[in-house]
Amino acid sequence: MVRKLKHHEQKLLKKVDFLEWKQDQGHRDTQVMRTYHIQNREDYHKYNRICGDIRRLANKLSLLPPTDPFRRKHEQLLLDKLYAMGVLTTKSKISDLENKVTVSAICRRRLPVIMHRLKMAETIQDAVKFIEQGHVRVGPNLINDPAYLVTRNMEDYVTWVDNSKIKKTLLRYRNQIDDFDFS
């Protein structure tokens, strides 16, 4: 039971909204975390910090004169790196980084999202389970961390571990099972 506020207390609290805080960003973080099934809030904050650093770097590069060779070289390096990572869908201009480099763009490169896109799992939650249980490898490396970011080049090498029960079931379903591999 709370007492009724006095007049001067009401006046002081008139402009304070207890439901919406500035630091919550309108609950954008929980929405992104739920969409991409991010388990640690720190991962979201790391991605947010990375996006801010990239935007800040792009802004500082844009302040240099357009004919500066240093600016041209580093703009191209930054754009190539972001395209190779898969954060950018096309090789674009440095001015597009403000809108295109987002936390969602980085989250789309997470291993569970790539597995869902490649139809290796029905949902992102299932993909997270498969990764944590040790069923997935990228290239020759077994991956147990769902926060693993897959580059554009490594996307083709996402596959099941050789002795995985899921791989065995898939091969049996397709009638491609080789008894020598699973003996």
Swiss-Prot record:
GO terms for cellular component: 90S preribosome; Mpp10 complex; nucleolus; nucleoplasm; small-subunit processome. This is U3 small nucleolar ribonucleoprotein protein IMP3. Component of a heterotrimeric complex containing IMP3, IMP4 and MPP10. Interacts with MPP10. Component of the ribosomal small subunit (SSU) processome composed of at least 40 protein subunits and snoRNA U3. Keywords: Nucleus, Ribonucleoprotein, Ribosome biogenesis, RNA-binding, rRNA processing, rRNA-binding. Required for the early cleavages at sites A0, A1 and A2 during 18S ribosomal pre-RNA processing. Pfam families: Ribosomal_S4, S4. Gene3D superfamilies: RNA-binding S4 domain. GO terms for molecular function: RNA folding chaperone; rRNA binding; snoRNA binding. One of its GO terms (biological process) is rRNA processing. CDD domains: S4 (cd00165). PROSITE patterns: S4 (PS50889). InterPro entries: Ribosomal_uS4, Ribosomal_uS4_N, S4_RNA-bd, S4_RNA-bd_sf. Residues 109-175 form the S4 RNA-binding domain.
